[in-house]
């Protein structure tokens, strides 16, 4: 099959053109041997722009064009220097930002069934993806001109390449002996992944239209890239047994070896055990008119996560330059002790169906998951001289319940109505932290969140607020608490004034401490995880009409609206348009506690509970109404049989 998509975007100079081709071949070579080949390929070209943010922040009182039709460029002075405001129309129409993607996937297999119950499968797959990007800013744009300082255009070329090969061998054997049914599966897989990236930027081209290839740029600006690869070898064995379709048992064992870890920690092993009891097959329920299906199940097993950087356990170095001299600098610290992250899961579930044809059905499941050796890329202290390292630094426990129900409320020939509902609740707790990677006893601060032993993950961490300073008297009262320290000063130029957010001194030492790695005045502000979440859907059909609706909900989580805080930070070097909430800011004429005043810098923007909001929601994702034409009408057209 062949498909073509050709569409223009809603934004100026955006488009998407994509070709895709699918080929399938399956054939029986003889009675016991079968082969097949599948090919999927796609070729796409996308014209794109990052102009939306530029347009949203552009001053609405400035024109896009001069009276003669040329582009308008707004000039202004900042600290004695002439600067220019970006014109979003120039960026949209003149910037040449195109990505071309080429992808191909080939899968071939051989299946042999030499005798009853035995199946052998050999499969090879190859996945290739290449992405080339060209991003050219002509000299008339703000970026391409170097801020209108005479630069003659700027071009960045990028290329990404990924190749993934997988060889899989599988043996399956199954047999039924009277009431006993069992099957055994063994799988071996070798996966080879390669990824590369290259980017190069040059400036100053002969013109903006024809001589704009990367080699025609005169001034070198920047380059970067990488070439990575990883191998994964996996073995899986699984056995299923059932007696009279009533008692079920599954045992599995998996071994994974990854080159992403050091030789001493390359392999990890993941066993599992699951049992189930189908009560419906018991005589006392076989003819029950209320309980149509009932199954109890329980399982315990271990799964692993080994996705870290391809050379995550090694110390890496980066190539750079300083004063036009080449140099090699440390990139990340190696860790020979880095190992697989492992999660042991315990699950107990009930599958049910009531009344004829499972008029009401669903599941109820309880689970407990214990994760050890949590993988994380840890930011190191600046004094070490290396930016980061991959580490195993935490243990986490999750406990929860999942419930879903499906009901066929009405089910007649012309009218049917069904409804589905699900809800989940999860509780988690940090049960351990590696002492080498904690910032204070028992906790580790990660930007605006904190991981603390004994508490949940996803906790916002920062300063508590107490409204807004309304007058100088309130400020003077706080400054008097500690004559040796300013009450609330993040920067040396930061001086409190009416309209600023008031932060609380939780340590009671008379001032709010902003020193790095000082947590005396910081506290947990809320959680990004909900108390519970779920979804629902309904479908109503009457003759040829069908109405359907689906939605999701979440309750109890908080969200930090970063963009909201930025509306009250003034950037004199680059004035921009703001959201209308800035009109509700504090002023002497509007002494509100809703929003602070706009200021050049200070503590009004940052992680405080002032910018945290209740993120509970109820969302309707989809509503549709369709009508299906009667089949006899369509037969009269001659298009269908």
Language model features by range: what are they?
Residues 391, 408-526:
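Conserved small-residue
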Residues 525-561:
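Glycine-rich, aromatic-lined ligand/substrate-binding cores of catalytic
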Residues 64, 138-154, 319-330, 380-389, ...:
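Solvent-exposed loop segments that connect transmembrane elements
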């Amino acid at each position: 099959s062949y498909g073509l998509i050709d569409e223009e975007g809603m934004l100026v100079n955006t488009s998407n053109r994509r070709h895709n081709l699918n080929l399938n071949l399956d054939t029986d070579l003889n009675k016991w041997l079968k082969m097949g080949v599948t090919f999927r390929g796609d070729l796409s070209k996308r014209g794109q722009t990052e102009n939306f943010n530029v347009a949203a922040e552009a001053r609405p009182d400035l024109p896009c064009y001069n009276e003669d039709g040329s582009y308008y460029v707004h000039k202004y002075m900042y600290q004695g220097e002439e600067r220019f405001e970006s014109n979003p129309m120039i960026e949209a129409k003149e910037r040449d930002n195109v990505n071309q993607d080429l992808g191909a996937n080939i899968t071939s297999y051989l299946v042999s069934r030499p005798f009853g119950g035995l199946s052998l499968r050999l499969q090879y797959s190859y996945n290739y993806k290449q992405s080339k990007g060209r991003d050219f800013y002509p000299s008339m744009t703000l970026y391409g001109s170097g801020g209108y300082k005479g630069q003659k255009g700027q071009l960045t070329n990028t290329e990404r390449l990924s190749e993934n090969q997988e060889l899989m061998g599988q043996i399956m054997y199954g047999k039924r002996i009277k009431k006993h049914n069992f099957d055994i599966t063994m799988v071996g897989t070798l996966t080879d992944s390669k990824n590369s990236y290259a980017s190069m930027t040059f400036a100053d081209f002969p013109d903006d239209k024809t001589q704009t290839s990367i080699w025609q740029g005169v001034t070198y600006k920047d380059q970067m890239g990488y070439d990575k690869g990883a191998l994964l070898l996996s073995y899986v064995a699984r056995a299923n047994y059932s007696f009279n379709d009533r008692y079920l048992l599954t045992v599995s064992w998996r071994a994974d070896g990854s080159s992403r870890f050091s030789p001493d920690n390359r392999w990890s092993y993941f066993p599992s055990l699951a049992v189930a009891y189908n009560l419906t097959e018991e005589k006392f329920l076989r003819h029950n008119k209320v309980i149509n299906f009932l199954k109890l199940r329980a399982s315990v097993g271990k799964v692993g996560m080994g996705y870290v950087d391809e050379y995550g356990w090694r110390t890496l170095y980066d190539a750079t330059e300083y004063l036009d001299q080449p140099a090699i600098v440390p990139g990340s610290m190696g860790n020979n002790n880095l190992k697989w992250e492992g999660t042991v899961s315990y699950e107990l579930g009930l599958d049910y169906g009531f009344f004829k044809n499972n008029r009401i059905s669903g599941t109820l499941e309880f689970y407990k998951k214990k994760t050890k050796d949590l993988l994380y890329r840890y930011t190191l202290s600046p004094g070490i001289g290396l930016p980061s390292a991959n580490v195993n630094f935490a243990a986490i426990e999750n406990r929860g319940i999942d419930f879903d129900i499906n009901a066929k409320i009405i089910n007649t020939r012309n009218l049917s109505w069904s409804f589905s509902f699900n809800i989940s609740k999860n509780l988690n707790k940090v049960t351990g932290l590696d002492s080498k990677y904690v910032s204070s006893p028992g906790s580790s601060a990660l930007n605006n969140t904190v991981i603390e032993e004994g508490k949940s993950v996803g906790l916002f961490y920062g300063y508590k607020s107490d409204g807004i300073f309304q007058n100088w008297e309130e400020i003077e009262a706080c400054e008097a608490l500690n004559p040796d320290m300013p009450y609330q000063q993040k920067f040396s130029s930061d001086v409190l004034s009416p309209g600023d957010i008031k932060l609380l001194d939780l340590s009671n030492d008379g001032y709010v401490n902003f020193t790095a790695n000082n947590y005396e005045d910081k506290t947990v502000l809320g959680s990004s995880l909900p108390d519970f979440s779920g979804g629902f859907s309904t479908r109503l059909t009457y003759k040829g009409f069908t109405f359907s609706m689906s939605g999701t909900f979440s309750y109890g989580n908080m969200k930090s609206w970063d963009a909201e805080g930025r509306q009250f930070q003034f950037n004199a070097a680059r004035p921009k348009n703001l959201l209308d909430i800035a009109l509700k800011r504090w002023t002497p004429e509007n002494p509100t506690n809703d929003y602070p005043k706009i200021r050049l810098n200070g503590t009004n923007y940052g992680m405080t509970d002032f910018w945290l909001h209740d993120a509970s929601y109820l969302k309707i994702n989809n509503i549709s109404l369709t009508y299906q034409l009667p089949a006899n009408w369509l037969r009269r057209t001659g298009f269908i049989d």
